[in-house]
């Protein structure tokens, strides 16, 4: 005897055509950007191959992030050659339990090295978030980089996915 798995569509609840925007219903992308202190930076190596490394990060604004990078690091050499990059940030605490159930976002943008004589605001922002970095921020081979956000791909949990532009992020009123 075989069981029938057909459903009566007349008894199924009706669903709205479109889920409300994650951005308009919460300030989650900005919260993640403002509270994340560590991220995975994706760059392209000399051969054009993807290269991912762990970096520390601080938000100057939701669309301008600051990184402190060593000139000895491969990701720094990659950014100097090709500034387009991505940065994965995970909502603090989201790495516990099932990390795929937590919120995270991938930032796409461009990173530029800041001049040492004009990086005071970036320096203050970064060192406020990473006090221990003061021990090496003055080393000659370290420089601050500003990552300018072009767009964000937000995964706010299972099935809650949205790609937003930098202008949408800054115009959100939540």
Segment roles from a protein language model:
Residues 58-61, 115, 153:
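A generic structural motif
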Residues 3-7, 12-80, 88:
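An N-terminal domain-cap segment
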Residues 36-38, 63-65, 82-85, 139-144, ...:
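Short, surface-exposed beta-edge/turn micro-motifs
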Residues 52-56, 106-108, 144-146, 152:
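Conserved hydrophobic/aromatic beta-strand scaffold that supports enzyme active sites
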Residues 2-24, 129-174:
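C-terminal edge-of-domain segments
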Residues 50, 76, 118, 154-156:
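Intrinsically disordered, low-complexity acidic/polar segments
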Residues 74-129, 139, 149:
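Short, structured beta-strand-loop surface elements
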Residues 40, 107, 155-157:
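Short glycine/serine/threonine-biased micro-segments
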